[in-house]
Each structure stands twice: as C-alpha cells, then as structure tokens.
Amino acid sequence: MATIHFTKVHGSQNDFFLVDEEENQIMDWSDAKRADFAIKLCDREHSLGGADGILYVTKSNEAGPIGQMRVVNSDGSIASMCGNGLRTVARYLLEKHALTEAKVETMKAILDVKKATSLGFDIPTYQVEISPVKFNAESLPMNVGVEKLFNQVVPELDSELAFSAVSVPNPHLITFVDQTVLDSDKQETLASYLNSENPYFPDGVNVSFVKRLSDDAIYVRTFERGVGFTNACGTAMSACSLIKKMLDKDTFETPLNVYNDGGRVQVTAKKDEAGEISLQLIGNATFVSTGSVSYERGTVTELTNEATPEQAQYQELVKEVKQFLKTTE
C-alpha cells in the first residue's frame, strides 16, 4: 500500500489535488499511474469531494526552473497547460524554496511566476505567465477552412455567432455573446460536440462564451476539454482577455478584470519587439486542505484531511463577485 500526501488547492475555484512527486517517491509515477490515480481521486463521489484534476509537481528537466508542473484532468487526459493550476503550483514552489519569483517548467514552456499584491481580503495572490500564444490552425489543431480564425462566423458551428481561436498553448474557441445566449443551451451543445469525435477540432477544444461587462471587465464561462463546465479556466480567461483587447484595439498592458463563476482575476498582455504575445494572469492561489490517501490495487482511500481557513477567506471575494454580477444581468 502506498500512502500519498496531497494539498487540495484551487484557483478561482477551479480545484485540484496538488501532489509533490519528490515528497511521494514511494510511488512509481508513470504516465499510466498518474492517469489512474487522477481518475480515482478526482471522482466527485469520492469522500474528499473530487477535483477537476491533479497537479503533479516534480523536478524540472532544465537548469533554471525551480520545478515542473504536469496537469492530468479528472478523466485521465493530459492538459498541456492550466493557468489556475499554475498559480497554486507557483505558490507551493515559491514557498517551498523561500522565493518571491522564479520560473516553472510546464509541458510546453518555461514560465515566469511571482507573488503578487492581493486582489482583496488578504487572499494569497500570484501572477503567472501564459505563453506561447499562437493563432495558426495547426497549433490548435483546427479544420474550419481558414488558417486563422478571428471574429468570424463559422456556419458549421453556428449561423450567427462570431468565433475566434487561439492556443495558449492549449486550444480555445471564443465567442462574445449577450445574456440571452448565455442562458441558452448553445454553449453546452456546441462544446459537447466539439469535444467528441468531430472534423473541426480533432483533439477537442476549450469553448468559452464571453459577456462584456464594461470597457475594463468581462465575464467568462468555459466548457473545458476533458472536464466540462468548471468554475473558471485560467488559460481561457487569459485567451478571452487577449481577444477582447484585439477586438477593441485596447492597450495591451492595461489590466482587464475577468469575472467568472469562481471569482475574479486580472489579465494583462504584452507584445515584444519580435511581435510575440505573452499574457500575465493574476489571481488567487488558495490552499483548501492537506491530507493523505492510500493507493492500493487501483483503489484510493482517504486517510487524513485537515482544512485550512483559506477557503472561508476566499468566499468573501466570491460573495462580492456574485453581488456585482447580479447588477450586470
């Protein structure tokens, strides 16, 4: 029997179990083991309440980063990137190494992370880089008859909605809608189709519907590939912010407030001299509890689980966000 220690975390209530492989060397962490463990532990019927996925933290393969993040979704599939998860990994590693900023390796890039000024209620807040940003069809991959999809109607997907597609580096399909469309079943129907066998996004895609709230604020709801609807998706909020800035020809460096069912984050963008775009995602990194489970013959059993006071703290922000969103309906 293997005893696995974890930290239950969330970014914008996009929740995960964080497992430090260096602290859990009793397990042979193969890709198959990571997937099976994620499927079992992330089951919402599990005594620990499940999660959207597991963040596996291990040593980096490179000299500079202080660690590496691997993301496995609740269905066992691998996510190339997770912005909400990266904020919690950033906090975990920075606290572990007594640093305020560093680099963390992900599956597609080495990214800057740092401790940031709290967004409110003394909630632990971290800033993480989201990149690389690509628009070409191959990066998603996408087959809708164009090399770059930006604010265009795709009749095969919907006869009225205008879509944009971007990888950051996981793929996102984005459309701006009004409250009537948000209240309909369009998003679930479209996203479910595009995340099953289909000719347009063969690897699936994260689908976000975005509502404008003001010049400096948007609301984002995302159907995540491999998960379904979540309280928030960090890379989706980043991607939607970029598309909004491009549509409105906004100043990239100006922070955009992004509201979601899990709270609020801020996103800024920048373009370097070579024209390469990178995004900065700023939001909470909440540690909900610490505990342990046994993992034996494919069965995951709760052993310990001790809550922290941080979730109650975060709920104050959620309450404020919900009150604000009611005024925008």
Swiss-Prot record:
Give the enzyme's main class according to its UniProt record, as a single word: isomerase
- Cite the annotated pathway: Amino-acid biosynthesis; L-lysine biosynthesis via DAP pathway; DL-2,6-diaminopimelate from LL-2,6-diaminopimelate: step 1/1
Q: Where is this site: Could be important to modulate the pK values of the two catalytic cysteine residues?
A: H172, E224
One GO biological process term = lysine biosynthetic process via diaminopimelate
Report the InterPro entries cross-referenced here. DAP_epimerase_AS, DAP_epimerase_DapF
Q: Which residues does the Swiss-Prot or TrEMBL record annotate as the active site?
A: C82 (proton donor), C233 (proton acceptor)
Q: Where in the cell is the protein located?
A: Cytoplasm
Q: Which GO terms describe its cellular component?
A: cytosol
EC number annotated for this UniProt entry? 5.1.1.7
Catalyses: (2S,6S)-2,6-diaminopimelate = meso-2,6-diaminopimelate
Does Isomerase show up as a keyword for this record? yes
| Chief location of this protein within or outside the cell | cytoplasm
The superkingdom of the source organism is Bacteria
Q: Name one GO molecular function term.
A: diaminopimelate epimerase activity
Q: PANTHER family, from UniProt?
A: DIAMINOPIMELATE EPIMERASE (PTHR31689:SF0), DIAMINOPIMELATE EPIMERASE, CHLOROPLASTIC (PTHR31689)
How this chain assembles, per its entry, is: Homodimer.
Function of the protein: Catalyzes the stereoinversion of LL-2,6-diaminopimelate (L,L-DAP) to meso-diaminopimelate (meso-DAP), a precursor of L-lysine and an essential component of the bacterial peptidoglycan.
Similarity comment text for this entry: Belongs to the diaminopimelate epimerase family.
Recorded hits in HAMAP family, A to Z, give: DAP_epimerase
Question: Any idea what this protein is called?
Answer: Diaminopimelate epimerase
